Amino acid sequence: MVHTAFMRPAANLQREPVYLKLANTLEGMIASRSLRPGDRVPSVRQFSQQQRVSVPTALQAYATLETRGLIEARPKSGFFVRRNQLELPPEPVMRPASAPRAIAIDGADPMEALLADHADSTLVPLGAALPSAELLPGVKLARILAAIGRQLGPRSVAYDMTPGHESLRRELARRSLDWGCALNADDFMVTVGATEALSLALRATCQPGDTVAVESPTYFGLAGMLRELQLKALPMPVDSADGMDLDTLERALRKTRVAACVVIPNFHNPIGFVMPDVNKRRLIELCVPRGIALIEDDTYADLQHEGPRPRSLKAFGRTEEIILCGSYSKKLAPGYRVGYLAAGQWQSRVRALKQASTLNGALLPTLAIAEFLKNGGYDRYLRTVRQAYRQQVNQMKEAVIESFPAGIGLSRPKGGFLLWCELPVTVDAVKLSGQARSAGISIAPGPLFSPGGDFKNFIRINCGYPWNSRIERAVGVLGHLVQKAAK
């Protein structure tokens, strides 16, 4: 529909080419915020049909808007309203006040409270890092599961014997080519999600009392694992562009004996950065010659917003000294709890540890994921969901910028569906979380993501749900609470 209120004066319109009239109309809609940064505009063909013009005319209008810096084309996704980078808040600043030191972890595990909040349907789910079920291929997976169950008959209730069904391990090996690796089925073991994979990796490489280098901030479930395994954490600062501060790590390794190093180099949780390849190589060079087990959490790496999938650490050689952990919980089916690890030289050890703990896995979910990866259209599904997450992250950014006070910092996620937000220093994120919950909103306060309880004025926001009026109102309420706390 053409909004004539945004057109130039009639005298000028008569002298303007049609493509320019259309470009000016859309520019007016962008200026009035009828179309917001991050919004997808109609496809060229759709726009030409709406405005009853030829496709070349519509394309010329879009080219004009691109030249004006108002929209941008994204590969295989279409055209989107562009945000002026100068308008974006700065990225969060996460430098520690003192040099890193190894610390023992105490306190309650934050996961239970966050997951309980997610299960409470009365709360707007901005806390736990879980995607909306409506974006996941639940119906198709259910059909696959039922078909496999009928095919197996009584055998469908059997265990999936360690190291996991070969059909899934073959698919993982095939997909490892996309990760920059060339692994084979025997390199993999199927686990109960990435959580078990990380736990097995730590148990295989560390003894109680050992020190583990971790990113700060990092996945908050890691702190609970370290505590239960009686391991110390050596928090390393991270940079939004480069990942773990490797200069700081190198200095720390001269003073502290470290048994393992856990990193999320691809679409980091909670920040969303990708560690550059040159830094990945240097990280390997710092850890492997010192006998430090390098453990990579690759959970979000399939969820890039654009471009190719980033390479895993195993793509840079020394694959036997690197443990790769991953899961299909964030990408396909959280409730199926299907994860994996490729443990290199520790493969026999992690297999023995699994057999001594969870023993075996669930057969049907494992086979269903394997079938979906092979014949279910996983790549086509990923193209759709990547676009959705990118749009949802951009919509959340826009709403936060509008509702929160000046002086905040916002991450620039390159993949996944999480947003890391630095609030004014006077805001206590833990108190804010309690106030938000009373208002019907779940968020994740920053101290959860630090073994030492840092990031007291940071929050992580889940963008895994399609944008709607309920989420928009919740962000407005949250912004009001931040405004009050910042005074």
Task: Name each model-derived stretch.
Residues 36, 259, 337:
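Short acidic/polar active-site loop segments enriched in Thr and Asp
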Residues 382-408:
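Conserved PLP-dependent catalytic core of the aminotransferase class-I/II
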Residues 318-387:
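Conserved core segment of the aminotransferase class I/II
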Residues 72-73, 183, 443:
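Short beta-strand "wing" residues that participate in macromolecule-binding interfaces
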Residues 1-148, 351, 355-362, 371-373, ...:
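N-terminal basic, amphipathic alpha-helical segments
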Residues 292, 322, 408, 441:
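Short, conserved active-site loop motifs that form the nucleotide-linked donor/cofactor pocket
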Residues 145, 150-290, 295, 301-319, ...:
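Conserved core of the PLP fold type I
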